[in-house]
Amino acid sequence: MASTFYIVHHEFKAGKAEKWWETAYAAMSPGGGWDDAVAANKEKGFFNHSANAVTKTGPVYCFWEVKDGISAEEFQDFIDGPSGPGFGQDALMNICKPIDTSLMNGQTPYPPVFS
C-alpha cells in the first residue's frame, strides 16, 4: 500500500509565534540539529515535504507524507508531540487532513519518499 499524504493547517496559539520562529530559525541554522531531526522523523515514518507560511503569525500549511501502516491518530500524536513541528512548545493548533489521491487518479502532491 502507498504512503498517505496530509495537508496540515497550523495556527499559532496566542503569544506563541515569535518564540516558535526563533526556535525554528535556530534549528535550521548550521549545527542547529535540523538534519538530524528530519532523519529521525523519517525513520519513524514521517516526512515533511514543505512548510508554507502565509504570514509570520500564521497560518502555516505543511505537506507531510506518512509511511503506510501509520494511523491518522498516530500521525496527529506525532504532529502534536515534542518531535513534531511545534518543537515541544505547545505553540501550534494542528489540523491534519489526509489527501485522497484517488480523486486525482493517484497523483501525489510530491514524489513519495516511502516505497
List each model region and its residues.
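Short S/T/G/P-rich N-terminal loop/turn motif that feeds into the first structured element of a domain
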Residues: 1-59, 65-77, 95-115
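A common structural junction motif
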Residues: 79-90
